């Protein structure tokens, strides 16, 4: 009897081997979340030394933090796009999410879902702290179709509401410090 292994079986087996190696061999990820994160802010506030007027100057953003097209495109979509879905990601990246998850694991030590969630949390924290965006707009910017998804994520991760998290993060002078 011949054993036939299809593409999906091969991918599943490969993913299992990679997961095992990543969890059990002292695997060191190539990139940290801080290295991958693309800030949503394009300008930084400063005060004119003569007039004291608040002005903005452009900030440089590394739009290709990994130099790997597939990962950089994912980061650009997740960090800089308005609302998107898993289908949008799959179509724009041209890869199945299971395959992409293994790719993420190799580069970051996190599978797609964990990486995506970590980026969403970081993005939401930045938007809540430095902008006066409505909560629903923050949620959309983080890839949720409505506020409830962001609320549930914050309740699960921080054990607090989005508004409570905003009050915890925000310091005097933060709003307007950066511009999208």
Task: List the predicted regions and their residue ranges.
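Basic, amphipathic alpha-helical hairpins
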Residues: 51-85, 104, 108, 125-134, ...
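Short coil turns linking two alpha-helices in DNA-binding domains
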Residues: 92, 96-98, 145-146
């Amino acid at each position: 009897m011949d054993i036939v292994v299809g593409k999906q079986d091969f991918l599943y087996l490969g993913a299992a081997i990679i997961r095992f190696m990543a969890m059990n061999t002292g695997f060191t990820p190539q990139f940290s979340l801080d290295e991958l994160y693309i800030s949503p802010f394009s300008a930084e506030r400063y005060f004119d030394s003569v007039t004291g007027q608040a002005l903005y100057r452009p900030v440089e953003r590394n739009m290709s933090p990994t130099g790997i097209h597939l990962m950089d495109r994912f980061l650009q979509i997740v960090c800089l796009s308005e609302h998107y879905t898993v289908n949008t990601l799959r179509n724009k990246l041209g890869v199945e999410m299971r395959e992409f998850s293994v790719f993420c694991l190799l580069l970051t030590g996190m599978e797609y879902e964990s990486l995506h969630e970590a980026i969403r949390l970081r993005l939401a924290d930045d938007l809540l702290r430095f902008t006066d965006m409505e909560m629903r707009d923050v949620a959309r910017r983080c890839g949720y179709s409505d506020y409830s998804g962001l609320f549930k994520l914050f309740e699960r991760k921080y054990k607090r509401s989005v508004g409570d998290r905003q009050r915890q993060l925000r310091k005097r002078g933060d709003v307007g410090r950066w511009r999208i």
